């Protein structure tokens, strides 16, 4: 067997990297590919399109190089219990992980919203499905340790980004066969949520500098969020590069709808609407699929009970299943640098938001110097994963100190970033008193602002009215939605019938003629056709 033949079986093109691997491991590869297990029924659980070149059951994943495993088409480590997938704005970054966490189910998620901001400036151009495989591979090797350390009973892998590169089919083919949950939503409702998305304050510049995505006693939480929590008018390729909130081209105090923003979400590299694409690539790896709507996670007690029975995790009765998780999504966890020598913001004559740029920079410089000797607290929501850890492994292990903060708004909890500093922090009465005063004010100010922000949200009718006046954009939406909904259209058309706003949108498109799509869409369609997804178009 030649290395060219091995490459053909592996469904890959020979290059310097894999040629060396195939040559070095040629005897082992030949032995496996000629074995009865590979040639017979034992290979059914492996991908037909990207079969493994070594027996996965004989691989010690914990001592293996993920990049080498990728070349050899080895499935990801089988250390998780089920898969959750769906598109953006479907609650996969809010209600689903929060409610799963309450039931002792831990999630592993890789995507653009989970990366380290300090390393993310060039994320849009650097992230690939190969890198996703490597990152997830490493994370999956930690699941047993996480379960043992924090008391989680189950773990799921969340697939909420769909990166359309040359390796996308291979990435999904290398997942172990599992049951899965698809969370889906009326696409017009999803687009509405995308159009009033807020920026993340940790990517904003305050006083000319990025202050560790947090605040200190000299900066009130109200001032911080009033200045930095804005609505995005447009997106750029350097989305994760810190920006100034006063840039009116990028940000505003109210959500907006415009052509550029909608096109960005429709043609974003992570494919915001991708249920159909992911299912088409993933279906060979799925054993059973449970489908839930985003609306099922409103007053979600019965939803969580149903999911617990389907996936075999423990159902924990909780009043939090009736709460909205996303209200505090962009506010928490808030990092607070506590230092007893920092002046309190109400002792300063002028709030930071009204100060000059020079003064703001100077105050930030002083604050950052003092922060070096600070004890960092996190003001977080009751849906923080560490709440579960507190209940199962104790407050000392999780760093929770909420009990020392009387009167704070009930939707908040307080943690030490470093739990080992608990005794030192609580023994410093001056520091504790200042922190108590600060967090009492911050919790109520933040909750009040969060409720006020909800009143600014767009409605589905706003999106429909905008699309009714824009034929080209409407046609682009229709084309993207057709692919996105292809799985439901084939297997669960009754769900599409419940999408009231999408069906209204479809009526707007009845008399639309075929139009020439923008170049960006042609490129995306060509990419999908190359990996066999052209059949998803009507």
Describe the predicted segments one by one.
Residues 22, 38, 46, 80-85, ...:
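Phenylalanine-focused residue identity feature
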Residues 1-75, 314-538:
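PAPS-dependent sulfotransferases, especially Golgi type II membrane carbohydrate sulfotransferases
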Residues 106-109, 131, 238, 242, ...:
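Intrinsic low-complexity, intrinsically disordered segments enriched in polar/basic residues
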Residues 27, 38-319, 329-358, 363-394, 401:
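PAPS-dependent sulfotransferase catalytic domain
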Residues 113-151, 169-181, 201, 211, ...:
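C-terminal or late-domain output modules
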């Amino acid at each position: 067997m030649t290395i060219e033949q091995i490459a053909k079986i592996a469904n890959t093109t020979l290059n310097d990297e894999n040629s060396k691997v195939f040559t070095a491991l040629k005897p082992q590869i030949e032995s496996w590919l000629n074995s009865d297990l590979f040639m017979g029924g034992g290979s059914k659980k492996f991908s037909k399109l990207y079969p493994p070149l070594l027996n996965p059951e004989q691989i010690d994943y914990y001592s293996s190089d993920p990049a080498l495993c990728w070349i050899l088409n080895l499935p990801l480590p089988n250390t998780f219990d089920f898969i959750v997938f769906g598109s953006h704005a479907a609650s996969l970054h809010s209600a689903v992980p929060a409610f799963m966490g309450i039931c002792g189910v831990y999630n592993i998620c890789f995507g653009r919203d989970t990366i380290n901001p300090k390393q993310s400036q060039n994320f849009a151009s650097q992230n690939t499905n190969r890198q996703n495989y490597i990152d997830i591979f490493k994370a999956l090797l930690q699941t047993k340790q996480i379960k043992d350390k924090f008391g989680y009973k189950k773990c799921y892998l969340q697939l909420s980004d769909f990166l359309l590169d040359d390796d996308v089919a291979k990435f999904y083919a290398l997942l172990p066969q599992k049951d899965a949950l698809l969370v889906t939503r009326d696409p017009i409702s999803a687009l509405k949520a995308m159009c009033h998305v807020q920026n993340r304050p940790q990517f904003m510049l305050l006083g000319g500098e990025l202050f560790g995505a947090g605040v200190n006693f000299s900066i009130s939480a109200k001032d911080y969020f009033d200045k930095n929590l804005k609505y995005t008018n447009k997106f750029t390729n350097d989305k994760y590069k810190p920006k100034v909130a006063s840039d009116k081209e990028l940000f505003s105090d109210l959500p907006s709808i415009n052509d550029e923003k909608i096109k960005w979400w429709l043609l974003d590299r992570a494919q915001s609407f991708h249920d159909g694409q992911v299912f088409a690539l993933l279906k060979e790896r799925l054993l059973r699929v449970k489908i839930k709507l985003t609306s099922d996670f409103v007053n979600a007690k019965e939803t969580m009970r149903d999911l617990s029975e389907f996936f075999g995790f423990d159902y924990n009765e909780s009043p939090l299943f009736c709460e909205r998780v996303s209200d505090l999504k962009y506010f928490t966890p808030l990092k607070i640098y506590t230092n007893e020598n920092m002046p309190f913001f109400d002792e300063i004559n002028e709030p930071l938001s009204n100060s000059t740029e020079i003064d703001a920079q100077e105050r930030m410089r002083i604050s950052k110097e003092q922060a070096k000797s600070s004890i960092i607290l996190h003001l977080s929501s009751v849906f923080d994963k560490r709440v579960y850890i507190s209940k199962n492994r104790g407050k000392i292990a999780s760093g929770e100190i909420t009990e020392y903060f009387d009167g704070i708004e009930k939707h908040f909890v307080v943690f030490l970033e470093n739990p080992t500093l608990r005794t030192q922090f609580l023994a410093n009465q001056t520091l504790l008193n200042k922190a108590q005063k600060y967090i009492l004010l911050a919790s109520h100010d933040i909750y009040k602002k969060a409720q006020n922000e909800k009143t600014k949200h767009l409605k589905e009718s706003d999106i429909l009215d905008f699309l009714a006046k824009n034929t080209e954009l409407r046609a682009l939406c229709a084309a993207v939605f057709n692919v996105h909904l292809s799985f439901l259209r084939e297997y669960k058309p009754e769900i599409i019938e419940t999408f009231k706003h999408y069906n209204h949108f479809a009526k707007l498109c009845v008399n639309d003629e075929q139009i020439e799509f923008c170049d960006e869409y042609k490129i995306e369609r060509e990419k999908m056709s190359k990996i066999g997804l052209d059949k998803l178009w009507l």
